[in-house]
From Swiss-Prot:
GO terms for biological process: cell wall organization; chaperone-mediated protein folding. Required for the biogenesis of type 1 fimbriae. Binds and interact with FimH. Residues 1-36 form the signal peptide. Belongs to the periplasmic pilus chaperone family. Keywords: Chaperone, Fimbrium biogenesis, Immunoglobulin domain, Periplasm, Signal. Its main location: periplasm. This is Chaperone protein FimC. GO terms for cellular component: outer membrane-bounded periplasmic space. It is found in: Periplasm. The keyword Cell cycle does not apply. The lineage of its organism: Bacteria, Pseudomonadati, Pseudomonadota, Gammaproteobacteria, Enterobacterales. The gene is fimC.
Length: 241
């Protein structure tokens, strides 16, 4: 190999390392700003049918920063959806302050009444620009917090805290199908087949979801789910059908 090719290769490796370092640094900065800045009061929103509104707390933990807060709801496909209205949709939030978002039901009872429906609650925090730094090269990052919003009909056949234990499993080729016979969405985590750790899964009500399954995975299943409060349920066991 010529010296020219060696130099080109070394230059490419250095460039790659620099880019990787920059991306890692930016990720750390974003994570730090997200933790120190705007936070939501819940990891998911449950909207009981028939209720006029539900509330979601928003807190600015950064004493020295003001954020513009923009909020909206999307459907399960990630498309903005007017069936739920967030108010106020846009407001400024000073440091060390808390505000409350009100989510209003505008579905007119058009959603299924025998199972939950999934939406996404979005809260974007846009940092204000420091006027003293307008002449400098600065990077302003808007952080979007996105959490699940479940519309829950009244009088479902099964209490929500009993849904996780009803989950069933079926093996087919190189995948494991999770079967949910309940009217609730199930967020499955810490899913194991024998000693193999599998992917997390969101299983729709009265539906199923598949995850990759290694060929040497065992038939004994253990898993946990996330409850209405964002906490993990106790570990459960299941057997492949």
């Amino acid at each position: 190999m010529s010296n020219k090719n060696v130099n080109v290769r070394k230059s490419q490796e250095i460039t790659f390392c620099l880019l990787a370092g920059i991306l890692m640094f930016m990720a750390m900065v974003v994570a730090g700003r997200a933790e120190a800045g705007v936070a939501l009061g819940a990891t998911r929103v449950i909207y009981p049918a028939g209720q006029k509104q539900v509330q979601l707390a928003v807190t600015n933990n950064d004493e020295n920063s003001t954020y513009l807060i923009q909020s909206w709801v999307e459907n399960a496909d990630g498309v903005k959806d007017g069936r739920f209205i967030v108010t106020p949709p846009l407001f400024a939030m000073k440091g060390k302050k808390e505000n409350t978002l009100r989510i209003l039901d505008a579905t007119n009872n058009q959603l299924p009444q025998d199972r939950e429906s999934l939406f996404w609650m979005n809260v974007k925090a846009i940092p204000s620009m420091d006027k003293s730094k307008l002449t400098e090269n600065t990077l302003q990052l808007a952080i979007i917090s996105r959490i699940k919003l479940y519309y829950r009909p009244a009088k479902l056949a099964l209490p929500p805290d009993q849904a996780a234990e009803k989950l069933r499993f079926r093996r087919s080729a190189n995948s494991l199908t999770l079967i949910n016979p309940t009217p609730y969405y199930l967020t499955v985590t810490e899913l194991n087949a024998g000693t193999r750790v599998l992917e997390n899964a969101l299983v729709p009500p009265m539906g199923e979801s598949a995850v990759k399954l290694p060929s040497d995975a065992g038939s004994n299943i253990t898993y946990r789910t996330i409850n209405d409060y964002g906490a993990l349920t106790p570990k459960m066991t299941g057997v492949m059908e």
